[in-house]
Amino acid sequence: LVAPLEFGPADGGTAASPTQWRAAPGGDVVLSGGTRLSGWTVAADRWTLQLPADQPLFSLLFVNDQPRYRPRLPQTGAYIIAEGLDPTPANRDRGGDQFRYRAGDLRPDWHNRDDVELVVFHQWNVSRMRIASLDEAESVVHFTGPTIATNYWAMPLTGHRYLVDNVREALNTPGQWYLDSRTRELTYLPLPGETPENTVVVAPRLEQVLRITGDPAADQLVRHLSFDGLTFAHTNWACPPQGNSYYQNEANLSAAVAALGLQDSDFTNCRFGDLTNHGMSLGAGCQRVNVERCVFTNLGAGGIKIGTTDVPADTRLHSGWNVVRDCTFSHGGRFHPAGPAVWIAMSPENLVEYNDICDFYQMAVSIGWTWGYDESLAYGNRIAHNRIWDIGQRLLSDM
């Protein structure tokens, strides 16, 4: 795709005659937000390719239907923050923007240092920050922007772990890749047995591959629309200049399939995979949407987001009464570790049942967006008969 596939109210059907999009019998239909790369120059241990000017920067590369990662430091384990520091005056009321590192862990002479990202693990969320400057004398790193809040759970604290991502000097392991943003040269270190002839390499371009956009506040809904047997793949996400940090569940991130005002509709036998963000978002006004027998795998963040983070005064904007049944969620949080398999925000009466959920770093199913006694729409949700295992894995400290 050169742009997301878009549907609006005029594209829906009726209860008697729903609009159906199905894979042809025996067909393999992939809606891809990426571009297959070819024309590699092959050397002894690496392939190189000059990317065109219109190819956006990307954070994951997909090789033979598997995510491949940029070089990071340390190559195993994590670095430890030597000392958490108060924010600088510019961000005193906004969030953390610096910490003291152990001497030698960070270097000012890294190639394209502005492209290096610090992945800071908090209690239940993760901040991905860019480097503004390094004070070698004091061993202090300053970010280009603050974390999401000054609360303890959003600050880079003493003893917290962090990774350094996208370091060209660490490129030494088969399966890794590095894109030089200045020269636009992509370098890939192939795994044993991989050749340009037997290897499909896809660079993601689009953040979304399918957008379904109604306007529930104006009673303009998309209804009776169904998708069967389709694959949604190869979405992109790039760290913004100020970094990325959010409260919980990677809730601010986009999804490969995003819907507003979608009702009485179905996703059946679909695959959501090889993504840098979430799989699906059922936002404001999405009601009675059934997601059944679908596979969500190799996810950059989470699987499905349902609802909104506020309580809309206009009840037409409420999302709920949806079903997630007999689906498989696996290998999530591969780039944004705090993404859960299923997140129900301010949304009532949803049913999540008979799903297999495994290999996520955050919760399998998260419900709600209220930390206290304020009004919540997250009532009447039923979570039943799901098989859940290999969750948390001690990556985030609350799991």
Language model features: what each stretch is:
Residues 124, 284-286:
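A generic beta-sheet turn/junction motif
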Residues 1-261, 266-271, 312-316:
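Extracellular polysaccharide-degrading/modifying enzymes targeting complex plant/algal/animal polysaccharides
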Residues 124, 335-336, 394:
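Functionally critical, cavity-lining and gating residues within the transmembrane helices
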Residues 6, 22, 30-32, 211, ...:
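Extracellular beta-strand solenoid repeats
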Residues 4, 207-209, 256, 278-279, ...:
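Structural detector of coil-to-beta-strand junctions
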Residues 223-234, 263-277, 286-301, 314-333, ...:
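Right-handed parallel beta-helix
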Residues 253-258, 276-283, 305, 309-316, ...:
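The substrate-binding groove and active-site-proximal loops of carbohydrate-active enzymes
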Residues 240-243, 337, 397:
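Short acidic, glycine/proline-rich loop/turn micro-motifs
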